[in-house]
Design a protein with these regions (language model features):
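N-terminal signal peptide c-region/cleavage motif recognized by signal peptidases
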Residues: 12-14
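Short, hydrophobic/amphipathic alpha-helical patches that form generic packing surfaces
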Residues: 78-90
Length: 184
């Protein structure tokens, strides 16, 4: 899965703490100020369960998040789904019907999980709007890879397999912030 995640990185936008930009990190750091650890003049850390949030102005969005729970980072999974979808659109290709069915089911489950676990909680409609914007933002960047579409179909084969299903089910089994790191 790690090799396939690296393939996805070729298509995906840089991962921050929250690829759909829905988590209010400032509010979390303010609300849990007593739990914030200042580790340097520019960096502070907040641990919420198995999620470690890092605030650092040198980061692309000022924050990043690391899911240390072992189930997999939901933000990464949402980014991979968006990568597959944007590549299929960019290359005017289609996945096999059974994979499309699985993809749509995962998309609905993942976006529901995302909205329920972001802070503040977000409606499915807002999460879907942000997801669609992420997909659209990746289409142009995916076009040069159309000659190597097998990279994406291999990723889809892996993600939408029975083995992948067990990983995805485990990933969605524990409510937590949908951060993007580590990426599978």
């Amino acid at each position: 899965m790690k090799r396939l995640a690296m393939i996805a990185a070729c298509y995906a936008v840089p991962l921050a703490a929250d690829p759909l930009d829905l988590i209010d990190y400032e509010a979390l750091f303010a609300e849990k100020a007593a739990d914030v650890m200042e580790v340097s003049e520019t960096r502070s850390i907040l641990c919420i369960g198995d999620i470690t949030l890092i605030r650092d102005e040198s980061l692309p969005r000022g924050y990043t998040g690391i899911d240390e729970g072992g189930q997999g980072a939901m933000g990464c999974f949402v980014s991979i789904l968006a990568t597959i979808e944007s590549a299929m659109q960019a290359c005017e290709a289609e996945l096999p019907a059974d994979q499309v069915e699985t993809q749509m089911a995962y998309r609905t489950q993942a976006l529901t999980f995302y909205g329920q676990n972001t802070v503040p909680e977000a409606s499915f409609e807002l999460v879907e709007e942000r997801y669609n914007a992420l997909v659209a933002s990746q289409i142009e960047g995916a076009r040069p890879f159309c000659s190597n579409l097998d990279l994406v179909t291999t990723l889809a084969d892996r993600v939408f397999s029975d083995e992948g299903a067990a990983e995805i089910s485990g990933m969605m089994s524990t409510p937590r912030l949908p951060v993007a790191n580590p990426c599978l």
